[in-house]
């Protein structure tokens, strides 16, 4: 059975089992979110390539708007996991309460700003006369309902940190199932529902998010939970400056990391948009396909954060390292399987979205690059997650800034414009970024300094 077989039979077989047991719900959750995004694009593609491109234009500004909350979520997961290992339930719930108050206030302010300035934001992202109005409509609806998404993400991050990955899986699977069903009913109009096109896709997404938000809130009402609303009320736990400072200390560098990453991603998206509507549509589907592989890494990353945080809180650094290595090994096996699927099924995947042969050919060329991207992507996502979960967020921020903001952008420009390779050249920038992050993360993980960080 090789290395993994020896692990299962040797000293760490119990740890490997715990990793898999905690990881599989997180993997299912992340995969289903990515799969729902792929289905969303598939249904939108029935409106034409312009619609796929329009929705694609909103992706990076939306994620840039959520960068602040992504950073906060990393802090929440890392701190709750560490407090779980330290067996400090009160401190963990204090972290959650403080974070939720902050999330509600910040999300309301962000939502108003993005809705008000939707048109110039989308124009900045490279919209054309064909895609602008649809993209603005979609963006306004999505960002108008972002508060529900932010609350859901905050609570789910805390639950993952506590090791409750099955709770977050149920929440997101339900939310995205509703999204898919409403997409079918509202995009083209079925069973008497109005055909709302792009607007229908946005409304479906927000409705699913509202349901997910309610389910997340209900998850902290269980009396036996480590994160427990009853416990919070009984002990009169309130937001504190100390908890806020802890969140900021862990999250500030993640925030800058997210901002610089989103700038890099947005630059790539703008370059892709300038290749034309058809190339942008093929690019967007390629990003959705790549998100499927990211989902596996993200699921294993969630498990690694919880297990590593708990191990470090319990003063077991060697166990923390072993959890990280085990997650990476499982991820490498998954990457090999995905490479085979993309290699032999890439053309078929693109034919689901487009009838135009020239767009399919563009997509097949993109798939050939994605095959190499996946190999580095899953492993770097896991190792980066391990480092963030331990609180080594400054290193991950610098590594991501160098890789995404600079290497990705420069190589994309050289490939797409200087060498004249078009959209495929831009994807070489994506590959260079993933390789760079993989190298940075692997070096840092193997140095082992991250296990000594206190949060």
Regions flagged by a language model, labelled:
Residues 1-26, 80-146, 195-252, 308-373, ...:
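Short alpha-helical transmembrane segments in multi-pass integral membrane proteins
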Residues 35-53, 122-129, 185-196, 255, ...:
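Helix-terminus/linker motif at the lipid-water interface of multi-pass membrane proteins
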Residues 52-112, 149-168, 280-346, 377-401, ...:
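Small-residue-rich hydrophobic transmembrane alpha-helices
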Residues 64-67, 179-183, 213-217, 292-295, ...:
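Hydrophobic transmembrane alpha-helices of multi-pass small-molecule transporters
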Residues 26, 30, 41-42, 78, ...:
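Transmembrane alpha-helix boundary and packing residues in multipass membrane permease domains
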């Amino acid at each position: 059975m090789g290395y993994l077989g020896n692990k299962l039979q040797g000293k760490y077989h119990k740890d490997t089992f715990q990793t898999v047991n905690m990881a599989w719900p997180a993997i299912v959750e992340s995969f289903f979110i990515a799969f729902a995004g792929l289905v969303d694009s598939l249904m939108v593609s029935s409106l034409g390539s312009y619609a796929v491109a329009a929705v694609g234009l909103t992706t990076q500004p939306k994620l840039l708007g959520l960068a602040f909350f992504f950073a906060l979520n990393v802090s929440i997961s890392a701190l709750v996991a560490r407090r779980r290992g330290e067996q400090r339930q009160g401190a963990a719930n204090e972290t959650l309460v403080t974070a939720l108050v902050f999330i509600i206030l910040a999300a309301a302010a962000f939502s108003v700003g993005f809705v008000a300035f939707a048109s110039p934001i989308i124009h900045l992202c490279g919209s054309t006369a064909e895609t602008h109005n649809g993209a603005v409509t979609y963006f306004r609806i999505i960002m108008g309902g972002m508060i529900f998404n932010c609350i859901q993400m905050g609570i789910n991050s805390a639950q993952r940190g506590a090791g409750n990955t099955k709770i977050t899986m149920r929440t997101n699977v339900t939310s995205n199932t509703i999204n898919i069903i409403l997409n079918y009913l509202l995009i083209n109009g079925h069973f008497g529902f109005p055909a709302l096109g792009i607007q229908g896709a946005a409304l479906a997404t927000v409705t699913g998010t509202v349901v997910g938000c309610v389910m997340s809130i209900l998850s902290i009402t269980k009396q036996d939970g480590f994160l427990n609303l009853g416990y919070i009320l009984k002990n009169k736990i309130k937001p504190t400056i100390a908890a806020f400072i802890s969140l900021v200390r862990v999250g500030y560098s993640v925030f800058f990391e997210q901002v610089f990453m989103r700038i890099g991603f947005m630059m790539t998206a703008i370059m892709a948009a300038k290749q034309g509507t058809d190339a942008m549509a093929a690019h967007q589907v390629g990003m959705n396909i790549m998100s499927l592989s990211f989902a596996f890494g993200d699921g294993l990353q969630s498990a690694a954060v919880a297990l590593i945080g708990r191990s470090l809180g319990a003063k077991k650094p060697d166990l923390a390292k072993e959890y990280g290595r085990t997650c990476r090994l499982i991820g490498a096996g998954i990457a090999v399987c995905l490479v085979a699927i993309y290699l032999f099924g890439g053309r078929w995947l693109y034919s689901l979205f487009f009838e135009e042969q020239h767009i399919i050919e563009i997509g097949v060329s993109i798939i050939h690059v994605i095959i190499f991207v996946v190999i580095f992507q899953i492993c770097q996502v896991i190792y980066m997650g391990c480092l963030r979960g331990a609180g080594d967020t400054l290193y991950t921020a610098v590594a991501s800034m160098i890789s995404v903001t600079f290497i990705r952008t420069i190589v994309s420009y050289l490939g797409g414009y200087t060498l004249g390779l078009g959209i495929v050249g831009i994807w070489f920038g994506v590959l260079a970024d993933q390789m760079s992050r993989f190298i940075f993360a692997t070096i840092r993980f193997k140095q082992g300094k991250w296990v000594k960080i206190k949060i």
